[in-house]
Amino acid sequence: MSKLKRNMGLGYTKERREELLSETRLGILSIAREKKGPLSVPVWHRWDTETGELRFTSGINIRKGEALLAAGRASFTLLDDDSGYVMLEGPVTYDEEYDFELELVGTGMRYLPDSGEDYVRSTYMNEGKPWPGIVLWRIKAESWLTYDSKASRAS
């Protein structure tokens, strides 16, 4: 029996994966759940190159927040325009006190340049503060899986 040669492709460099994570792209957050499939939802995010953390704001008392608290870990996947991807995985923590302008309003403005600030302030804030239970979630990237389709085609 002959062995099949498998071409698993090439991964992104650290610089390219951080560049992709810093772009304004919708990513998919996946959280393992007991006796169920994973909860996978799209999220707006912000990549912090200094800390190596993926950051996003969301409710703590909603299905996503409850799943994050129960699992304590999550993964996040982002596609590039050429069928490549970057996936990170790691422990999840949250902060109730955070820089609202940067993390909540700033992220909204990244994704909706013309209306993001108004959208976030009218949907997630009251009198300049986030609604109770809107927290900053952080995933500390411990493991990576990436695929660079351009590099794989060239090799």
Question: PLM ranges: what are they?
Answer:
Residues S2-I28:
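Short, basic/aromatic recognition patches
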Residues D80-D82:
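Short, charged beta-turn/beta-strand-edge "cap" motif at the junction between a beta-strand
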Residues R17, R25, G52, G84, ...:
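A generic secondary-structure signal marking the coil-to-beta-strand transition
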Residues R17, K64-A67, F100-L104:
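Amphipathic alpha-helical interface surfaces
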Residues M1-Y12, Y85-S155:
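Charged, gly/pro-rich active-site loop segments
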Residues L69-A74, M109, P113:
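Short, intrinsically disordered, mixed-charge
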Residues T24-I60, L68, A74-L78, M87-P91:
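Short beta-strand segments
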Residues K14, N61-I62:
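Structural motif corresponding to alpha-helix initiation and N-cap regions
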